[in-house]
Amino acid sequence: MKVSAALLCLLLIAATFSPQGLAQPDAINAPVTCCYNFTNRKISVQRLASYRRITSSKCPKEAVIFKTIVAKEICADPKQKWVQDSMDHLDKQTQTLKT
């Protein structure tokens, strides 16, 4: 009986100090893409295929990553008007394709 109680205590202690990474969902451990520099040039909407927003707290800046029709990814500042206009254009294009 003493052996099983000691074993139970040992298991509880081991569980308390075990790494929490094993209990986290896969998305938390997924790599994060961050933008450290933004393009200085406006990109023509005809060259853009899609975009995604980067809002992770692990990144130093919020950003938009545009993907061009030749699969190149370009970081842009979401505060700039041309970036917002390009996102709106791509959103409308996507909605048109869905309907």
UniProtKB/Swiss-Prot annotation:
InterPro entries: Chemokine_b/g/d (IPR039809), Chemokine_CC_CS (IPR000827), Chemokine_IL8-like_dom (IPR001811), Interleukin_8-like_sf (IPR036048)
Record-level Gene Ontology MF annotations: CCR chemokine receptor binding; chemokine activity
Source organism of this protein record: Pongo abelii
Family indicated by similarity: Belongs to the intercrine beta (chemokine CC) family.
CDD domains, sorted: Chemokine_CC
Keywords, in A-Z order: Chemotaxis, Cytokine, Disulfide bond, Glycoprotein, Inflammatory response, Pyrrolidone carboxylic acid, Secreted, Signal
SUPFAM superfamilies: Interleukin 8-like chemokines
Cellular component aspect of the GO annotation: extracellular space
PANTHER family: C-C MOTIF CHEMOKINE 2 (PTHR12015:SF98), SMALL INDUCIBLE CYTOKINE A (PTHR12015)
Gene3D superfamilies found in the cross-reference section: 2.40.50.40
Positions of disulphide bridges: C34-C59, C35-C75
First and last residue of the signal peptide: 1-23
GO biological process: antimicrobial humoral immune response mediated by antimicrobial peptide; chemokine-mediated signaling pathway; eosinophil chemotaxis; inflammatory response; positive regulation of cell migration; positive regulation of synaptic transmission, glutamatergic; sensory perception of pain
Presence of the UniProt keyword Glycoprotein in the record: yes
Functional description taken from the UniProt entry: Acts as a ligand for C-C chemokine receptor CCR2. Signals through binding and activation of CCR2 and induces a strong chemotactic response and mobilization of intracellular calcium ions. Exhibits a chemotactic activity for monocytes and basophils but not neutrophils or eosinophils. Plays an important role in mediating peripheral nerve injury-induced neuropathic pain. Increases NMDA-mediated synaptic transmission in both dopamine D1 and D2 receptor-containing neurons, which may be caused by MAPK/ERK-dependent phosphorylation of GRIN2B/NMDAR2B.
Post-translational modification summary for this protein: Processing at the N-terminus can regulate receptor and target cell selectivity. Deletion of the N-terminal residue converts it from an activator of basophil to an eosinophil chemoattractant. N-Glycosylated.
Highest taxon listed in the record's lineage: Eukaryota
Known partners and oligomeric status: Monomer or homodimer; in equilibrium. Is tethered on endothelial cells by glycosaminoglycan (GAG) side chains of proteoglycans. Interacts with TNFAIP6 (via Link domain).
Name assigned to this protein: C-C motif chemokine 2
Name of a matching Pfam family: IL8
Subcellular locations according to the entry: Secreted
Location of Pyrrolidone carboxylic acid modifications: Q24
Gene designation: CCL2
Glycan-linked positions: N37
